[in-house]
Amino acid sequence: VSDDALAVVVVTHNSAGALAALGASLTPQLRGDDELVIVDNASSDATVSMARNLGERAQVIETRVNAGFAAGCRRGVQASAAPLLFLLNPDTVLADGALERLRAVAASRPDWAAWQPAVMLPDGRINTAGGVVHFLGIGWAGRCGHGAGGLATQPYEAAFASGAALVVRRDDWQQLGGLRDDYFLYGEDLDLGLRLWLAGRRVGVEPRARVTHDYVFDRGAQKWFLLERNRWRTLLATYPLALLVALAPALVAAELGILAIAARDGWLRAKLRAQLATAIGLPRTLARRRAVQGTRRIGAAAFAAHLTAELDSPNLAAPRAAATLGGAYWRLMRLLLR
């Protein structure tokens, strides 16, 4: 197996309608030493039969329960051997040459542990040009909704790479434990990205590789529950202690503000469930924090450099006054952390 062989891992759940398009764009780009592993999370439609139709080289793993995206990815990684892992959503389509461009990053950027292509929406706008993380732990798809003309023409770094189309070196995956399987869904890519930066590794984007993602932002209560619960799990485990102390007043104020927004927008119960889950899981989170911080190779100031005070996602919005105060607070904290 060559050093740039890819293990493509696709996790499915009732994804029958998407697999034909994915397969048509993906399988012609696979090399002889690449692998294709499809992990089906207890689909009730024709996903498994569609997956088997992708060809003999497709290894299809069926699970009896839907344990979530990260758990499915971990199962697929365990069943593969290639040195580069490519975690790919089933509702994606690869542009011509995307795999070769992503593969080439392994040699051209040896300090990158993880990277992504430019992930595009079906209408040609950007879905994500690299993940962005607010200092409160809120993450989002960078430049979502912007025109493709604003994309860079050379590789660049980002806070985290999107789990919709995520390349990770197997060595780094194994050293840091890969995606957290207790997240079920949402934020596991952000968590991995911050852990990689904390460990002294780097994360980036190869914008010349393009993948189209049939993405729609879900505003359901269950998503808000998972986003908020997982935000706190990531924040408490990955942020250096000096940064947590510096942010404590802002985190408390933000919780009050988010509670008010949740009450206004109809997901207060989901937010309260997330707080309860965070409290109940605190002993486990603190135990995990000790393990994560044991891998740390950079200080609080260097880690903070990968966070931002700007909240420019079209799917998330903060009141102007709160954004202004947050920006001033963050600038002050960055100075104190130096």
Identify the role of each PLM range:
Residues 159-210:
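A short, conserved alpha-helix in the catalytic core of glycosyltransferases
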Residues 85:
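Short aromatic/hydrophobic "clamp" motif used to bind/position activated sugar donors
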Residues 199-307, 326-327:
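Active-site-adjacent helix/loop segment of glycosyltransferases
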Residues 25, 40-49, 65:
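A conserved acidic beta->alpha catalytic loop
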Residues 93-133:
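Conserved donor NDP-sugar-binding/catalytic core segment of glycosyltransferases
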Residues 18-20, 45-53:
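Acidic helix N-cap motif at the loop->helix transition within catalytic regions
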Residues 62-80, 90:
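Glycine-rich, basic loop-to-helix element that forms the pyrophosphate-binding segment
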Residues 24-33:
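Short, acidic, metal-binding catalytic loop of nucleotide-sugar glycosyltransferases
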